[in-house]
Structure formats: C-alpha cells, structure tokens
C-alpha cells in the first residue's frame, strides 16, 4: 500500500508510534482509561487557570467544526451577540452555524490571505456595544 502525506487541516498524518498506540482498544470503564481522562481534564483546568470547584472540562470527540459548533451553541445565550472575525473557511462556517442556530451575530470578513485589521475590530465593537463574544 502506498504511504501518503495528508496535507489537510487536522492531525491526520501520524507517526508510527502513535499508530501503534492506537492499536490498543481502550474501554471507558477501565481504570487506566478513566485515570488518563481525569488527568487531561485536570490539566485543562490548570491551563485555563480556573478552579475545579467552579469549572469542569468536558472532553468531546469530533471534528474541528464540531468543536466550534458545540462552543457557539452552548456558550452564547439568547441575549448575547457574536462578532465573527472571518478570514477563512472556519470563519465562514461560524457564520453558517450562527445563522442556523439563530445566534445574533455580525461578521467582519477579510480576504483569506489577509490578517484582520485590529482597528476595524475595535470600530465594530464600538459601533456594536451589544456584542458580548468575539470569535
């Protein structure tokens, strides 16, 4: 079989050592698996500099779009408004997700090969004081 380098977004091309580790079937009820999961969750809270008494980390499996959609549809409330800074496919997809989920939003579009201008973002925030979230 021919070996390919996958040049698409995401961690698709993996090393032999990672592939070998993936050959082992982990069960969610195994103590080793639970220990690994709890360590990851604790490290995420530490990374975010928040207390386990007030916050938790939920590990979710899915594509990048799945992760973005899960955040947009669970963090942004009905009275909130989202400013999407879009200079690529993910930004455009966030606009689609926000529209489909009836999330109040506005989009600052920039060409795919350009860096969004911070002064434009500042202006949009000043003109739209009801914006509560920026992505």
Where does each model-flagged region fall?
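A glycine-/small-polar-enriched, mobile loop at the entrance of the PLP active site in fold-type I
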Residues: 2-48, 52-59
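Generic hydrophobic alpha-helical segments
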Residues: 44, 71, 121-125
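Short beta->alpha junction loops
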Residues: 59-61, 108-114
């Amino acid at each position: 079989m021919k070996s390919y380098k996958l040049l698409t977004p995401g961690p698709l091309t993996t090393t032999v050592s990672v592939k070998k580790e993936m050959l082992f079937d982990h069960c969610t009820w195994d103590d080793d698996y639970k220990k690994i999961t709890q360590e990851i969750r604790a490290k995420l809270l530490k990374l975010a500099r928040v207390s386990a008494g007030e916050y938790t980390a939920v590990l979710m499996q899915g594509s990048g779009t799945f992760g973005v959609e899960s955040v947009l549809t669970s963090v942004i409330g009905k009275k909130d408004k989202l400013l999407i800074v879009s200079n690529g496919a993910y930004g455009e997809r966030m606009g689609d997700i926000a529209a489909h989920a009836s999330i109040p939003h506005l989009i600052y579009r920039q060409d795919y090969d350009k860096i969004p201008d911070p002064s434009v973002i500042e202006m949009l925030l000043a003109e739209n004081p009801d914006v509560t979230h920026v992505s």
